[in-house]
Amino acid sequence: MNTSPGTVGSDPVILATAGYDHTVRFWQAHSGICTRTVQHQDSQVNALEITPDRTMIAAAGYQHIRMYDLNSNNPNPIISYDGVNKNVASVGFHEDGRWMYTGGEDCTARIWDLRSRNLQCQRIFQVNAPINCVCLHPNQAELIVGDQSGAIHIWDLKTDHNEQLIPEPEVSITSAHIDPDASYMAAVNSTGNCYVWNLTGGIGDEVTQLIPKTKIPAHTRYALQCRFSPDSTLLATCSADQTCKIWRTSNFSLMTELSIKSSNPGESSRGWMWGCAFSGDSQYIVTASSDNLARLWCVETGEIKREYGGHQKAVVCLAFNDSVLG
């Protein structure tokens, strides 16, 4: 892997944030210093993801996907794709970086071949409602797709077969995630509920089976994201209620509430907690919120360790990678 000294890709910790001010910002996680700003002219950024080899970052926006180089300070995207209708809401990668997946308001999830320099859409999965989220099963063979009609689709990439489940009809699924051990799947929705399933199967030719585990009334307002920790012991949920809540997966009890609510009764809402990402050791979490800040928190104590200030508008997505490649 060729990384130039002084580039984002040369840092063992990559933290990037983006949102409504049409910039992607890169931060030195421990100091809070912004080390690079990329102008993302065409629209807001809805989702960010770092490639598994840490060479590029994908930014999903309105009717496009842009990929920026992490190993140079090139301000321009090195790969662009503009052939998608409406907002691209979700983006991620196969673990070997062979393909990328996206989902969006055009009611499609797509798989893109990354082996050629021009993005080729290889496969399309069509649903009947705008897609809010797509996540990849750790087996790399099934995509979980959540849509605004309340449906969760499990798309088996090997057979092209799909199953669907609807936890609450007509209540939009905003985020879904499977823990690294493939023991649980969680999904949150626009009423603030979080559903958790036990997973079985999903090995070899077996299709993943979902067994309902629990329903958590996690938030009283819109929930925006759910993420399991790398060690599978924690689940984080983010919401429009200005909190990110950390739940223990041993019994799905609340461990910590991270809040950006003001202690000053006269101050209005600081806005939504849009997204989060755990550190590799599961001890810390970074959040993105619409008060223009990202924050680094200690998971156990709920203490804010660092604030990342510089965005001029809401921060709605982030990407965090502190795993050092061997």
Curated annotation (Swiss-Prot):
PROSITE patterns: WD_REPEATS_1 (PS00678), WD_REPEATS_2 (PS50082), WD_REPEATS_REGION (PS50294). GO terms for biological process: regulation of actin cytoskeleton organization; TOR signaling; TORC2 signaling. The modification N-acetylmethionine is found at residue 1. There is a cross-link at residues 86, 215, 245, 261, 305 (Glycyl lysine isopeptide (Lys-Gly) (interchain with G-Cter in SUMO3)). GO terms for cellular component: cytoplasm; lysosomal membrane; TORC1 complex; TORC2 complex. InterPro entries: G-protein_beta_WD-40_rep (IPR020472), MLST8 (IPR037588), Quinoprotein_ADH-like_sf (IPR011047), WD40/YVTN_repeat-like_dom_sf (IPR015943), WD40_repeat_CS (IPR019775), WD40_rpt (IPR001680). Pfam families: WD40 (PF00400). The keyword Cytoplasm applies. There is a cross-link at residues 305, 313 (Glycyl lysine isopeptide (Lys-Gly) (interchain with G-Cter in ubiquitin)). Part of the mechanistic target of rapamycin complex 1 (mTORC1) which contains MTOR, MLST8 and RPTOR. mTORC1 associates with AKT1S1/PRAS40, which inhibits its activity. mTORC1 binds to and is inhibited by FKBP12-rapamycin. Within mTORC1, interacts directly with MTOR and RPTOR. Component of the mechanistic target of rapamycin complex 2 (mTORC2), consisting in two heterotretramers composed of MTOR, MLST8, RICTOR and MAPKAP1/SIN1. Contrary to mTORC1, mTORC2 does not bind to and is not sensitive to FKBP12-rapamycin. mTORC1 and mTORC2 associate with DEPTOR, which regulates their activity. Belongs to the WD repeat LST8 family. This is Target of rapamycin complex subunit LST8. The gene is MLST8.
